């Protein structure tokens, strides 16, 4: 069975075409900077044929048309026709309170998804447009929605509720949802294999560190708490997001700057975090260069990021009652930035969590798994590249095959 996974961003479209039988990647790539004159299409085929195409792509609809041309291009030899694709798995950022697992798409599901678009206004409406287009392009393929929030639906009320009026939760669904769930699901499954343990016996602290970052406490193989909240703005100091702040800052700065609350929220999302503190970049590689050049704000940005991470690790150790099997670093920064890993775990050796500095310094490659714990460490410290697409692939395949059995 050939399955296409689609990860729709507000201005991008990431795709992978799999042959499920052996999880072989037939083609993968990204279409970036959609809606601009500097759109870029990057493609990699199973023969490692690389293609880069510069093209003005005005919309996600046009991006999908370009994707179809790529997949059916005889020169690339990926597929002969679109009917070969039997399943499509969509990553959906926000599933709201009702989508606790991945689901096969139908009219009722699509209607329910439209109702919660306000919870993720930058991502869900665009994803819905892509779904509607793929329904027309692939009328015979089963489509599956995989939600980044579903993984965290196992959290208890005392973890996901805010201490706001209870009616806000009951009437308006105001609560912590958490994100990066597809990544956490993959990492948890992978750690179970690495440690040769049943997933239900695992207690983990997983750090998904990228331009958007979060931490997940996993207890008995399921999500117990996470740092992001109703939206991805809560939690750690990130590339451009502030993370945790006093909410009174919003009306205060709205008045001081004579800007609307929505504009202040935009600043907290797009002009804060590492970019806001460093005064130069949201990219930690640029910021580390600033540290080497003794730039005060670059040094401060790194310290703030590591300090926030350390606070969350400490609090999650407490709620897991100091009984954890591993601390896992994943995503772009988590896998490649040895400096952030070292700073974030400094001091934890006093409670048996000790990093091996030499192993840590060598763990910089994007696609390599590493054990960076010292021989003395009572807790494993692992670096594992994430694979959200593989989670989407497995969920899509499993739901389609279950659906086919039910019809027999």
Swiss-Prot record:
Its EC number is 2.7.2.1. ATP binds at residues 14, 208-212, 283-285. The active site is at 148 (proton donor/acceptor). It catalyses: acetate + ATP = acetyl phosphate + ADP. Mg(2+) binds at residues 7, 388. PROSITE patterns: ACETATE_KINASE_1, ACETATE_KINASE_2. GO terms for biological process: acetate metabolic process; acetyl-CoA biosynthetic process. The lineage of its organism: Bacteria, Pseudomonadati, Spirochaetota, Spirochaetia, Spirochaetales. The record marks 180, 241 as: Transition state stabilizer. Its cofactor is Mg(2+); Mn(2+). Keywords: ATP-binding, Cytoplasm, Kinase, Magnesium, Metal-binding, Nucleotide-binding, Transferase. It holds the Pfam family Acetate_kinase. Belongs to the acetokinase family. The gene is ackA. Catalyzes the formation of acetyl phosphate from acetate and ATP. Can also catalyze the reverse reaction. GO terms for molecular function: acetate kinase activity; ATP binding; magnesium ion binding. InterPro entries: Ac/propionate_kinase (IPR004372), Aliphatic_acid_kin_short-chain (IPR000890), Aliphatic_acid_kinase_CS (IPR023865), ATPase_NBD (IPR043129). This is Acetate kinase. NCBIfam families: ackA (TIGR00016). Gene3D superfamilies: 3.30.420.40. Pathway: Metabolic intermediate biosynthesis; acetyl-CoA biosynthesis; acetyl-CoA from acetate: step 1/2. Homodimer. GO terms for cellular component: cytoplasm. It is found in: Cytoplasm. Its main location: cytoplasm. Mg(2+). Can also accept Mn(2+). Substrate binds at residue 91. CDD domains: ASKHA_NBD_AcK_PK.
């Amino acid at each position: 069975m050939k399955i296409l996974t689609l990860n729709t961003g507000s201005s991008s479209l990431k795709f992978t075409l799999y042959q499920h039988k052996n999880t072989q990647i037939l083609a993968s790539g990204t279409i970036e900077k959609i809606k601009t004159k500097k759109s870029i299409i990057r493609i990699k085929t199973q023969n490692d044929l690389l293609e880069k195409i510069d093209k003005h792509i005005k919309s996600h609809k046009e991006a999908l048309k370009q994707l179809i041309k790529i997949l059916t291009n005889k020169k690339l030899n990926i597929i002969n026709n679109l009917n070969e694709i039997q399943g499509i798995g969509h990553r959906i950022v926000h599933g709201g309170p009702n989508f606790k697992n991945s689901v096969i798409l139908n009219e009722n599901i699509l209607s329910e998804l439209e109702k919660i678009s306000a919870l993720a206004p930058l991502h869900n409406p665009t994803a819905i447009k892509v779904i509607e287009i793929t329904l027309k392009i692939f009328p015979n393929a089963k489509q599956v929605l995989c939600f980044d929030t579903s993984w965290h639906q196992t959290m208890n009320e005392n973890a996901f509720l805010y201490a706001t009026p209870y009616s806000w939760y009951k009437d308006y669904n105001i609560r912590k949802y958490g994100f990066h769930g597809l990544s956490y699901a993959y990492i948890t499954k992978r750690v179970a294999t690495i440690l040769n343990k049943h997933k239900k016996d695992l207690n983990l602290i997983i750090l998904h560190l990228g331009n958007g970052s979060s931490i997940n406490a996993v207890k008995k193989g399921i999500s117990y708490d996470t740092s992001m909240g109703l939206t991805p703005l809560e939690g750690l100091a990130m590339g451009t997001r502030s993370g945790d702040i006093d909410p009174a800052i919003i009306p205060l700065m709205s008045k001081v700057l004579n800007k609307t609350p929505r504009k202040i929220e935009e600043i907290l999302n797009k002009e804060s975090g590492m970019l806001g503190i460093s005064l130069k970049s949201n990219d930690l590689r640029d910021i580390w260069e600033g540290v080497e050049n003794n730039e005060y704000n670059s040094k401060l940005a790194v310290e703030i990021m590591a300090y926030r991470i350390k606070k969350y690790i400490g609090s999650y150790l407490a709620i897991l009652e100091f009984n954890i099997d591993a601390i896992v670093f994943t995503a772009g920064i988590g896998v490649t930035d040895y400096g952030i890993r070292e700073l974030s775990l400094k001091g934890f050796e006093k409670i048996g969590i000790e990093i091996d500095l030499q192993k840590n310094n060598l763990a910089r490659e994007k696609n390599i798994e590493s054990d960076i714990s010292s021989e003395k460490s009572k807790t494993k410290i692992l670096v594992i590249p994430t694979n959200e697409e593989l989670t989407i692939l497995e969920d899509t395949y499993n739901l389609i095959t279950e659906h086919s059995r039910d019809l027999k």
